From Swiss-Prot:
CDD domains: LPMO_AA10 (cd21177). This is Chitin-binding protein CbpD. The keyword Signal applies. Keywords: Chitin-binding, Phosphoprotein, Secreted, Signal. It is found in: Secreted. It comes from Pseudomonas aeruginosa (strain UCBPP-PA14). It holds the Pfam family GbpA_2. GO terms for cellular component: extracellular region. The gene is cpbD.
Length: 389
């Protein structure tokens, strides 16, 4: 049996997109995931949660592919003037109107302070632009999620304001004291105001306060499964340190019974938690314990020290000793024919005559993107979407 490998980039690559005569910075909250980023990670074409499905039905999939563009170009600190009540989560833009849906079932992330009383927020940014501030607001006690979010629903002052932060490995990491006395579900509203431009970015972050007094863990992000995997597939959690070196690897070969989209994250989490004291996967409770659950998206990856990131590699079996997909020289399309049909695994022939395979989700969404950036072999960021065969 031969195998071929795919990397599930659970913390996806972001891009610094420089359009002619206009530079655009992009970003959104990664930990805890913003509403738009969380829905993107569920899969724009087939999100898992009812709320994200409703967002796509209301605003289309493009809003999720553009998860890093929830912004206003001329905010310049006047946020209430450019983002109307009821449209805070979508930054007042029609493209993102699905994010404004008033509902109580938006997927939320449990958060708790560490031993110092802080929580580390991680913002995924695509370019090192100068920061005027990151402001973090929280909804008032008694906020009704079934009514559109208004500015008056937020506490009048931010509970955290960051004015100096360095971009490291594509992220801003900010330690903030969490607001006191908050329990249950709330919305954190984040504003990133640039100092080198009037542009500002906005993010609704759905959270739940666990009530834990001291949390020994730092969240890195959710372990998400997009689909069932075949028996014989191997899933590997890779943990990288601040220098990008492999710190730990935990592999599990799946069998019938633990290869479903809800089962294999549970099985991998159980193995990791048994083997490692540095990293655990699961749901955090009020006592600081991390317990795996059978779910395709609810398990989070936690570490005991800052400075780590993770990814999950998936090695799929190819029955009958066959070659890696595309190994026989055949292609599904000559690029850009059939562009809207491109998905993970699609093989195309580029303008250079070479064959390229569309990468696994979440990178697969870029395969349908603008050819200036994603044309296989020649786009400015083609390697984020395609693998040369």
């Amino acid at each position: 049996m031969k195998h071929y490998s795919a990397t599930l980039a659970l913390l996806p690559l972001t891009l610094a997109l420089f359009l002619p005569q206009a530079a655009h910075a992009h970003g959104s909250m990664e930990t805890p995931p913003s509403r738009v980023y969380g829905c993107f990670l569920e899969g724009p074409e087939n999100p898992k949660s009812a709320a994200c499905k409703a967002a796509v039905a209301a605003g289309g999939t493009q809003a999720l592919y553009d998860w890093n563009g929830v912004n206003q170009g001329n905010a310049n600190g006047n946020h209430q003037a450019v983002v109307p009540d009821g449209q805070l989560c979508g930054a007042g833009k029609a493209l993102f109107k699905g994010l404004n849906l008033a509902r109580s079932d938006w997927p939320s992330t449990a958060i708790a302070p560490d031993a110092s009383g802080n929580f580390q927020f991680v913002y995924k940014a695509s370019a090192p632009h100068a920061t005027r501030y990151f402001d973090f607001y929280i909804t008032k006690d008694g906020y009704n999620p079934e009514k559109p979010l208004a500015w008056s629903d937020l506490e009048p002052a931010p509970f955290c304001s960051i004015t100096s932060v360095k971009l490291e490995n594509g992220t801003y990491r900010m330690n903030c004291p969490l607001p006191q006395g908050k329990t249950g579900k709330h919305v954190i509203y984040n504003v990133w105001q640039r100092s080198d431009s009037p542009e500002a970015f906005y993010a609704c972050i759905d959270v739940s306060f666990s009530g834990a007094v001291a949390n020994p863990w730092q969240a890195l992000g959710n372990l998400r499964a997009q689909q069932d995997l075949p028996a014989g597939a191997t899933v590997t959690l890779r943990l990288f340190d601040a220098q990008g070196r492999d710190a730990q690897r935990h592999s599990l070969t799946l069998a019938q019974g633990n290869n479903g989209a809800k089962q294999w994250p549970l099985a991998l989490a159980q193995k990791v938690n048994q083997d490692s004291t540095l990293v655990n996967i699961g749901v955090l409770d009020a006592y600081g314990a991390v317990s795996p659950v059978a779910s395709s998206q609810d398990n989070q990856v936690y570490v005991r020290q800052a400075g780590y990131r993770f990814q999950v590699d998936i090695e799929l079996p190819v029955e009958g000793g066959g070659e890696q997909p595309g190994g026989d020289g055949k292609v599904d399309f000559d690029y850009p024919q059939g562009l809207q049909q491109y998905d993970a695994g699609t093989v195309v022939r580029g303008a250079d005559g070479k064959r390229y395979q569309c990468k696994p989700y979440p990178n697969s969404g870029w395969c349908k993107g603008w050819d200036l950036y994603y044309a296989p072999g020649k786009g400015m960021a083609w390697q984020d979407a395609w693998t040369l065969l």
